[in-house]
Curated annotation (Swiss-Prot):
GO terms for cellular component: cytoplasm; nucleus. The gene is foxo. The lineage of its organism: Eukaryota, Metazoa, Ecdysozoa, Arthropoda, Hexapoda. One of its GO terms (molecular function) is RNA polymerase II cis-regulatory region sequence-specific DNA binding. It comes from Drosophila sechellia (Fruit fly). Residues 62-79, 220-229, 255-264 have a biased composition (Polar residues). This is Forkhead box protein O. InterPro entries: Fork_head_dom, TF_fork_head_CS_2, WH-like_DNA-bd_sf, WH_DNA-bd_sf.
């Protein structure tokens, strides 16, 4: 009873009430009585008394004591708890050592510090009592599989190829492995201490940048419920930034602060949009448009892509009014001006009344064909109109246009809503002025093109057409004309064109040098009509065709002469070979006749009468 603090209590009576002294002499005592072996599932964990102290293990493994301490001894309790936490491990059937510890002992006990897999199995059976009766093939499949698993899993074991052929590899201890509890290979790709340090430094750098930009950037877009992580995400190392950090959209949020997890933190005030949403009115009192953003918008709207898009829309919207003869000429396209002073001077949006001309273009005029339908253009244009742009529904430059009832309703709604802020109204008027000036000039260009297309072709006079820098690629024209085989007729009654004909050399003509025959230019002194030019072209084509025919005939004649020469050569060779063959045949016949002369029968046959 060395392992117990006190002796087990003695039982005086059994469950049936019989005294233990009465049963002591009747029971046979076996001196060699040993505990019977049980299955592993019933072996551990075994129930132990509360004051049990475990004895020392065979393999010098230590385990903290589970003995309860007195409540007053707090210092000793803390030390025992730390020791128990440090040395605690899962208790196996053979002790506290794991499979990796047993394999380490096996390899370390070898003379050359290396063992094969079969030698490790043998060491387990010989040195660990639990595996002594489990060396056969039936009961060793489980623990042998665990040993193979631990050999390939832990970093402390290293596989070395065996020098002999057909032999298993050696397993050795890795000298570079870290001491203590080994790190599994599967966990090596996960977060390590080095990765944690690097990520921590990156977090600190980002937090410092956020704190530095809170004062300047958070004031630009005020939001009562927005946080730094939601509105001030910077990437200083990004190649996109120039000068300052690249700021993401204020609506962007990280995964941790998504809309689903931070519904109460969303701001009721919309963030600043570079492109306004035409379906909803924009609150200009809560947003500030910088001059850089305004210039970027003006440059974007002045590109050719926007011109083509707006021109297409204007052609669709004003197709009904393109044939009106009473329309005045439209002004050319003028790029938007950036100076604020000029914008205020040229602004048609004054509180007194609208300015005359094209500046009072109404958005309702863009949907003349959609007037009878439920078009969305009407409703989208209502939100961005000022009172001055809505009052005048008929422009003096367009006497045929119809007044719109929708614009009057919109104006009444604006008046009933109350007076707006003067500063916000000025900003809104300036932006609408820029947009409408662009649409007006583009509309004028498109309508001018449509009106020009409506004119008859007879009014087009080439004499009044400026031909100072007019040039024509004659080579492409001639090639296209020749591709039709000379059947294309050009009978357009146009005026004369100043031409300069460059005469070609006296040599043979070809398609490559036809381009040198004519060069239309404004500096020429001779005038030829289009019919004369067509006649010259046909004549040149005929000459070129004749020249090609002559060349083809010459080539054919040369080919025939070459064939005749070949035939003559073949005939000469054939005659000589024929003579030689005839001589050979004649000599053979003579020899045969001489050989067969003695056997010639001179008498007639018997049946001849």
């Amino acid at each position: 009873m060395d392992g117990y603090a006190q002796e087990w209590p003695r039982l005086t009576h059994t469950d049936n009430g019989l005294a233990m002294d009465q049963l002591g002499g009747d029971l046979p005592l076996d001196v060699g009585f040993e505990p019977q072996t049980r299955a592993r599932s019933n072996t551990w964990p075994c129930p132990r008394p509360e004051n049990f102290v475990e004895p020392t293990d065979e393999l010098d493994s230590t385990k903290a004591s589970n003995q309860q301490l007195a409540p007053g001894d707090s210092q000793q309790a803390i030390q025992n708890a730390n020791a128990a936490k440090k040395n605690s491990s899962r208790r196996n059937a053979w002790g506290n050592l794991s499979y990796a510890d047993l394999i380490t002992h096996a390899i370390g006990s070898a003379a050359d510090k290396r063992l094969t897999l079969s030698q490790i199995y043998e060491w387990m059976v010989q040195n660990v009592p639990y595996f002594k009766d489990k060396g056969d093939s039936n009961s060793s499949a489980g623990w042998k599989n665990s040993i193979r698993h631990n050999l390939s899993l832990h970093n402390r074991f290293m596989r070395v190829q065996n020098e002999g052929t057909g032999k298993s590899s050696w397993w050795m201890l890795n000298p570079e492995a870290k001491p203590g509890k080994s790190v599994r290979r599967r966990a090596a790709s996960m977060e390590t201490s080095r990765y944690e340090k690097r990520r921590g430094r990156a977090k600190k750098r980002v937090e410092a940048l956020r704190q530095a930009g809170v004062v300047g950037l958070n004031d630009a877009t005020p939001s009562p419920s927005s946080s730094v992580s939601e509105g001030l995400d910077h990437f200083p190392e990004s190649p996109l930034h120039s000068g300052g950090g690249f700021q993401l959209s204020p609506d962007f949020r990280q995964r941790a602060s998504s809309n689903a997890s931070s519904c109460g933190r969303l701001s009721p005030i919309r963030a600043l949009d570079l492109e306004p949403d035409w379906g909803f009115p924009v609150d200009y009192q809560n947003t500030t448009m910088t001059q850089a953003h305004a210039q970027a918008l003006e440059e974007l709207t002045g590109t050719m892509a926007d011109e083509l898009t707006l021109c297409t829309q204007q052609q669709q919207g004003f197709s009904a009014a393109s044939g009106l003869p009473s329309q005045p000429p439209h002004p050319p396209y003028q790029p938007p001006q950036h100076q604020q002073g000029q914008q205020q001077q040229q602004s048609p949006y004054a509180l007194n009344g609208p300015a005359p001309g094209y500046n009072t273009l109404q958005p309702q005029s863009q949907c003349l064909l959609h007037r009878s339908l439920n078009c969305s253009c009407m409703h989208n244009a209502r939100d961005g109109l000022s009172p001055n742009s809505v009052t005048t529904t008929m422009s003096p430059a367009y006497p045929n246009s119809e007044p719109s009832s929708d614009s009057l309703n919109t104006y009444s709604n604006v008046v009933l809503d109350g007076p707006a802020d003067t500063a916000a109204l000025m900003v809104q008027q300036q932006q609408q002025q820029q947009q409408q000036q662009m649409s007006t000039s583009l509309e004028g260009q498109c309508l001018e093109v449509l009106n020009n297309e409506a004119q008859p072709i007879d009014e087009f006079n080439l004499e009044n057409f400026p031909v100072g820098n007019l040039e024509c690629n004659v080579e492409e024209l001639l090639q296209q004309e020749m591709s039709y085989g000379g059947l294309l007729d050009i009978n357009i009654p146009l005026a004369t064109v100043n031409t300069n004909v460059v005469n070609s050399s006296s040599g043979p003509l070809s398609i490559s040098n036809i381009s040198n025959l004519s060069n239309i230019s404004s500096n020429s002194g001779s005038s030829l009509s289009l019919n004369q030019l067509q006649a010259q072209l046909q004549q040149q084509q005929q000459q070129a065709q004749q020249q090609q025919q002559q060349q083809a005939q010459q080539q054919q004649q040369q080919h025939q002469q070459h064939q005749q020469q070949l035939l003559l050569n073949n005939n000469n060779n054939g005659s000589s070979s024929l003579e030689l063959a005839t001589q050979t045949v004649s000599t053979n016949l003579n020899a045969r006749v001489q050989y067969s002369q003695p056997s010639v029968v001179t008498s007639p046959p018997s049946w001849v009468h």
